[in-house]
Amino acid sequence: MFSRLLAAITRKTYRAIEEPQANPAPPTQAPPGQGQENAHAARPEAQRAHALFDAGDYSAARDAYEHLAQTQAAPGLMVNCGYCELMLGEPDKARKSFEAALALAPHLAQAWVGLGDIAARHNRHEEALRAYDKAIALEDSQGIARNNRAQSLLALGRLEEAWRENEARFSTPGATALYPHRLALPRWDGGAGRRLLVHWEQGFGDIIQHLRFLPLAVQRIAQVGGGSCNFECPPPLLTLLQRMPGAPTIIAAGEMAPELSSFDCQAPLLSLPLLLGCRADALPSTPYLRADQPAADVLGQAWRQRDTRRLVGIAWRASSFDPQRSLTLAALLAAFAPRATELRLVSLQKDISAEERALLTLHEGIDAGANFDSFDDTAAALAAVDSVVSVDTAVAHLAGALARPTLLLLNEPAAVRWMPDVEDSPWYGSLRLLRKNANDDWEVLLRRAATLL
C-alpha cells in the first residue's frame, strides 16, 4: 500500500481534499529514476517508459525499462524497474533490481531509498531507517529519503524526530500537488504575538488528526497581546470546526486570498506539533471536536423508534488512493448477520451505490450517509450511534476526535500513524485497532469484530 505522496509523484493527479476517507500511509516511494539513465533520457523509448509509469501502467513501464536496459547496463534504468516491481507488489524482484543498480553504482542514493521502502512495506522500520540514512549521506538533498524516513520514525513512535524530518515533504517531487499553498508570507517560528494563518494540507483524515494542535497555537499566539490565530478550513469541515473548543478564527478555503494582507505569517497544519514543541507523551487528548448534540438526539430518536437494538455505525470504503484499505459491504453484513437481533447497522458512507443501498435495506440497515452534506452531519450520526466499525478512513479519524468507541479495521502494512503490532493508538484513546494478517481475508477480521461488540 502506498501513500498519496507517491500518487502525486508518479501520476500528478493528487486531489488534496478527498471524500471522507486520509497521512501518511506506509512510507512513500521515490519517483522512478528519471534522469539517472542519462544515455537514454532523450530517447523516445525512455519518454514512453516514463509516461507509462506516470499513467500507472507499471507492467508495461517495466517492460519498456527492461528493453532499454538491454542496450546498456544503466543503473538508473534498474532503479526504475525496481519501482515498477514495487508498485506491482513484487518486493523480492524490486530488491534484486535495486541491488543490481547498486552493484553498478554504489553511490546511487535512489536505490538505497528503494531498499528502505521495501523494508518499510514489511514493517522493518529500523532497517528502513538505515537505508534512508545511507541515501541521505550520499545525497543530502534527498528530500524523498528524508520524507520517507519521517514516516518510519512515525511508525516507530519517535514522533518528535518524525515531525522534524517531515518538513522534507515540501522538497519532494510532487510537492506542489500535495501542498498547493504558495503564500507570500514568512513561515511562523512558533513565537507569540503574531497574526498567524494556519492552512490545511493533505487529506481529510490528516486534517482531522492534526486539528487537535490548533487550540495550542491559539494559546501560543495569545501569550503576547495583539496576536491572532486563523485556520483556513476546507468547506466540508467548516461548521464542525466553528464548534471546536478553543478554536481559532475559521476561514473557508478560497476566501482567504483577498485578506492575505491581514496576516504576518503562515504555517502548514501538519507542522504545528514541531513549531509548538509538542511531545509524544503529551499529545492533546480527545475529544477535541464536538458534534451537534440536538441533531444527534433527533437522529437517535428516529433510529430507535420501536427498535431496541444497539446502533453500530459502519464505514467500509476508504479513499481511492489506497483501495487496499477498503472491504465490501456484503462481507461486513455477512459477518454481522449472526448478531442481527442485537445490532442494527448504520451506514456512515457517502455516495453508496444502488446495489449497496438495496443490500443495506435487505439487512434492515440505515443509510445515514445519504443525508451527509458535511462532516458536521457525519459527527451528529457518530454521536447518535453506540459504537463504530470502520476501515482506515476520515470517518475513523472523526470518531476518534469525538472519542466515540470504535473498532478500526486495518490491512497490513497499515498507515504509519497506527504503528505496527499495537491495538491502541496514542492519537485516539477510544479506538481499538484490529489488524488483518497478510494471509487472512477481511472476513476473518470482520468475524472477530462482530464478536467484540
Sequence positions of predicted segments:
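Alpha-helical solenoid repeat scaffolds of the TPR/TPR-like class and their adjacent stem/linker regions
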Residues: 1-387, 392-453
